């Protein structure tokens, strides 16, 4: 049996230390076959004895036999290579491994996003939201879904907020805005012409722009009164924006909780009342 296929088939039943080895071998088989057992142990973060035992659990006499199996597996792959489909996720990964890679990627994106935004900057953005007469939230595609979700939460705690995802309606809305209004634009790339045009118009009428966008300098950053940054590992060709959406969602949830903390007298009661109203529909 193909050595890589054998690892994939047994992956779900492996112990945690064995999964570390399996992850490394599945991700970098070409590198692994040139390593000694000690070198592989160091790379995977396990003991040398774990490497030998892992090879034996797979049915090989030892690590040299496993390396030979990896070489044979790689040699047989030219006609049907393992296709990368999203960052470290490959087309032939078991679903359990896909899930673990997604969790690792999304968690890393959320931690990186939290670390790049200072406490002071977060409080400044909370103040902007609390001071706004009306909050217009927008985004395109997946970012628009994050904007919609945040708008619903803001309304639950008494804010005059609305998500506008139709770009023609967005432009009509911002041109009729007042200096007390706030545009919250969510865009990982910050390059979409529609959003930047809306930001320009909001600034023209005297309003403010809060951007949730990527850390790489972009046009939306240049227009924003304040920025919160998202850090995510996204490929230029990837349209799913998986980790970016998790980072955006974490930031908006953080702002939501901060707003509740600053209105403990009324916000929790408003949430309960909103939930009670919804229950009447059932």
Swiss-Prot record:
It comes from the Bacteria. One of its GO terms (biological process) is carbohydrate derivative metabolic process. Signal peptide: none annotated. Residues 37-56 bind DNA. Keywords: DNA-binding, Transcription, Transcription regulation. NCBIfam families: PRK11557.1. PANTHER family: GLUCOKINASE, HTH-TYPE TRANSCRIPTIONAL REGULATOR MURR. This is Uncharacterized HTH-type transcriptional regulator YfhH. It comes from Escherichia coli (strain K12).
């Amino acid at each position: 049996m193909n050595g890589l296929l054998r690892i994939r088939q047994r992956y779900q039943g492996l112990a945690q230390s064995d999964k570390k080895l399996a992850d490394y071998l599945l991700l970098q088989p070409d590198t692994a076959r040139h390593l000694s057992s000690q070198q592989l142990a160091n790379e995977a973060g396990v003991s040398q004895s774990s490497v030998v035992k892992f090879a034996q659990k797979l049915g090989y006499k030892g690590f040299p036999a496993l390396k030979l199996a990896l070489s044979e597996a790689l040699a047989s792959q030219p006609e049907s290579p393992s296709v990368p489909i999203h960052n470290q996720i490959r087309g032939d990964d078991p679903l359990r491994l896909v899930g673990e890679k997604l969790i690792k990627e999304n968690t890393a994106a959320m931690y990186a996003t939290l670390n790049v935004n200072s406490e002071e900057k977060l409080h400044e953005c909370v103040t902007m939201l609390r001071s706004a007469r009306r909050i217009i939230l927008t985004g395109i595609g997946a970012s628009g879904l994050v904007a919609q979700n945040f708008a619903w939460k803001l309304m639950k705690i008494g804010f005059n907020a609305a998500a506008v995802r139709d770009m023609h309606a967005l432009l009509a809305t911002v041109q009729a805005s007042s200096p007390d209004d706030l545009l919250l634009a969510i865009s990982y790339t910050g390059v979409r012409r529609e959003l930047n045009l809306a930001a320009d118009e909001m600034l023209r009428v005297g309003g403010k722009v809060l951007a949730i966008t990527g850390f790489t300098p972009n046009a939306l950053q240049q227009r924003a009164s304040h920025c919160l940054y998202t850090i995510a590992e996204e490929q230029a060709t990837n349209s799913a924006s998986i980790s970016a959406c998790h980072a955006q969602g974490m930031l908006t949830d953080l702002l939501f909780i901060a707003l509740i903390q600053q209105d403990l007298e009324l916000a929790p009661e408003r949430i309960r009342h909103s939930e009670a109203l919804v229950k009447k529909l059932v």
